[in-house]
């Protein structure tokens, strides 16, 4: 009998073991769809980004008008740009839901997979930040100025570091050029990291909603989960295309329709919605270095999750107190996102400070404490 090429060819064998014959727990829910959705987001962003880069000019005098030219004169340029800008929002929606799933179901106990995932999140945040600067509108320019300026809070080397990053004494042409280079490069780094992420995942196999070993009950990935993933793609592309076609500027900032002007500061400088929770934490501390450290900690705290897991059960499926705490954390993140979009005045200052303290308290103190308490209550 002739050997099955899919199982014997060195390259096809890898694809087969990752996407076709991969043993998958039979009970994984729709929350396990977000990994593949993130993959399709990345592919969409790279494709639309490549098409946009063909018409973009990374120069302060031409950047704004080159984006306008793409939208006005290039065939379907407006659609490509709208899909790319809103695709970033969907990328972040998917990654936040993906992290939330991992947190709820204790997937962080696969330490290598979890840690590479956080590195992926940080790379994605960096990519989105440098990308936001490229249209060279008012919010692009001032966002770049404010965020890069945060590095000056680093003792001793801060100011030198910022001027080195800028390529001068302010955000200017060299900054835009290097940001474009970085924005082109980083998605490919994300693609590489994704392969590492998947390699670590396939070492252990997927977790499942019950958090128990599922080796006795696994089914092939294809056709069951390929079909389920395609349904997921459809359900994501529908709202994405609707947003890009009907209200493409809903999530953007009106300030970005004004070309960058170093002499006029916008009344409220704020990042895109997906960074607002971290921005609120940054603003809630009146000290510059303290704010920067809190900003970094807001994401880096995720690295501690595996070490703060004190419960004897892996998932929160059968732990009602932890579930309650989890949903309080989610609500708290929504409050932080809302506060980050508001001006720095009473009562938003105090709400932001309380929400920031609550965020770290829940993650660092309450989750381990409640986990230990539940062990006692369940006589573990």
From Swiss-Prot:
A Pfam entry, by short name: Cytochrome_B
Cofactor comment: Binds 2 heme b groups non-covalently.
Named cofactor requirement(s): heme b
GO molecular function: metal ion binding; ubiquinol-cytochrome-c reductase activity
Membrane topology summary: Multi-pass membrane protein
Compartmental location: Mitochondrion inner membrane
GO terms under cellular component: mitochondrial inner membrane; respiratory chain complex III
Keyword tags: Electron transport, Heme, Iron, Membrane, Metal-binding, Mitochondrion, Mitochondrion inner membrane, Respiratory chain, Transmembrane, Transmembrane helix, Transport, Ubiquinone
Family listed: Belongs to the cytochrome b family.
Assembly information from the UniProt record: The cytochrome bc1 complex contains 11 subunits: 3 respiratory subunits (MT-CYB, CYC1 and UQCRFS1), 2 core proteins (UQCRC1 and UQCRC2) and 6 low-molecular weight proteins (UQCRH/QCR6, UQCRB/QCR7, UQCRQ/QCR8, UQCR10/QCR9, UQCR11/QCR10 and a cleavage product of UQCRFS1). This cytochrome bc1 complex then forms a dimer.
Protein name listed in UniProt: Cytochrome b
Gene from which the chain derives: MT-CYB
